[in-house]
A protein has these predicted regions:
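Charged, low-complexity intrinsically disordered terminal segments
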Residues: 1-179
Length: 179
């Protein structure tokens, strides 16, 4: 969600009664999102427009959607927005996650409804666990997609052997995707 190029929200929020716990299909629904202001909103706008153009072919002049960055007070840290889409062969998301995992010094905490890992990320997490990094993963204990739930659980063994700790959220469904 991008509002006037000033504020952006990103996360796993869906729109339906079950996602605001009005209707309880899987128990209490847990999700996470982030509100972004500052220069990264421009990145979020650009990512949206790239996907918009790829899907619609709309070649309009999008300059009106791009706001000039305002001078902001210096702060410690930064936000780097990135997108990973099926329209190219780049594994941006996987590379970002692998880099974050390999540079962890104390802990790696992951919330995910769908722990579907390839060997590259599995090995990165296992190496972190074996090197003494506190690796904790929270997945749903109540599945919304049974096949994906079984696939998620099939990844547990190797991770547990490497020292990761895995928790299943049982009061409902955890839809958060956070690391």
């Amino acid at each position: 969600l991008n509002i006037d190029g000033r504020v952006a929200y990103t996360g796993g929020f869906n729109v339906a009664d079950e996602y605001i716990n009005r209707k309880m299909r899987f128990g209490v629904w847990k999700d996470a999102g982030v509100r972004i202001t500052g220069p990264s909103v421009l990145n979020m706008t650009s990512m949206f427009l790239q996907i918009w153009y790829a899907v619609t072919g709309d070649g309009s002049d999008f300059r009106s959607f791009i706001r000039e960055n305002e001078e902001l007070p210096a702060k410690e840290g930064f936000v780097q927005a990135f997108s990973d889409m099926p329209l190219d062969d780049e594994a941006v998301g996987e590379n970002v996650y692998a880099d974050l995992i390999s540079h962890a010094q104390k802990y790696i905490y992951i919330y995910t409804p769908y722990l579907v890992l390839d060997s590259y990320l599995t090995q990165a997490l296992c190496q972190a666990g074996r090197s003494g990094i506190d690796v904790r993963i929270v997945t749903p204990g109540i599945p919304d997609k049974k096949i994906v739930y079984l696939l998620t659980r099939s990844n547990y063994g190797e991770l547990l052997e490497a020292g990761a700790r895995i928790f299943e959220y049982t009061p409902g469904f955890i839809h958060s995707k956070c690391m």
